[in-house]
Amino acid sequence: MSEIGTRVYTECDADLSLIQNVLVAVIGYGSQGHAQALNLRDSGVNVVIGLKENSASRKSAQDSGFEVLLPQEAAKKAQLISLLVPDPAQRDVYESAIKHNLSEGDALLFSHGFNIRYGYITPPDGVDVLMVAPKGPGHMVRREYLDNRGTPAVFAIEKDASGRCFDLALSYAKGIGALRAGAIQTTFTEETETDLFGEQAVLCGGLEQLIQYGYETLVEAGYQPEVAYFEVLHELKLIIDLIVEGGLSKSRWSISDTAEYGSYVSGPRVIDKHVKENMKKILGEIRSGEFANRFIKDQDSGANEFTQLREIAARHPIEEVGARLRALFSWSK
């Protein structure tokens, strides 16, 4: 048990033979799909890949030595189906290829709880529904496995039809290498809501907006765009690495006294109580399903809003400056 009372499960807590004794169909061969499939195979698990006939990933999966079937064929053949296509595509893939090929005793696994949490997918009775969600992108999941390390994960049980779903989740987590680092049990609801909040308020949305505003403030005050880029974006990795290694305290210990003092007196003025209130509103939209409904509605109508927002973000001046600088310096090659 950890000091905060949350149990961290490691390799000694899992029986790898459970996942080795079933056929796993990995549906999708993108970031998580390719990493989890390769790691499972290297752990002695029988894996087939399910991809549409026109999928751009078919050749990559075949070149990696996998048997590649159509999604419905893979789902019918396997006892555990790992659905690793992007969230917006999962409903259609489930309805067209998986739903009618599930048998009692099968297991349906996700690496994000979005479609279960918001009711876009409702698996039938008699089927285990579980989640193993690595806390890192696919290339990291694969790289850490090959380096005899692991990427931490969370896991959850939504429906334990077989009575062995908990053990199966841990076995799968061990198969992809996650238990080398450790896994924490959660729920589909907790994983989905906290993951979306982290992405929107801090890791992606909040951080990107903070970087852009910092860049704009310096450039509008007359400083060189290149210098502004270094100060508010490039050096961010140095700080993030310190935080990941040893928490906020290691970052504070490692920076200069000037920087540390400035962070205390100025940080709360930038990220003030109004920011926290806005964060609470965002969390409320996530918990109520408002965000999910907006996202899926836009996706279903052609992703017009998403496309427009992506194009606007790509036109920000920091992108051109960054591309030019990265082309000049050896650290980007």
Swiss-Prot record:
Annotated binding of substrate, by residue: S256
Cofactor note: Binds 2 magnesium ions per subunit.
InterPro entries the record matches: 6-PGluconate_DH-like_C_sf, KARI, KARI_C, KARI_N, KARI_prok, NAD(P)-bd_dom_sf
GO BP terms in the entry: isoleucine biosynthetic process; L-valine biosynthetic process
Highest taxon in the source lineage: Bacteria
Species, as recorded: Tropheryma whipplei (strain Twist) (Whipple's bacillus)
Encoding gene (name): ilvC
EC code(s) of this entry: 1.1.1.86
Name of the protein this chain belongs to: Ketol-acid reductoisomerase (NADP(+))
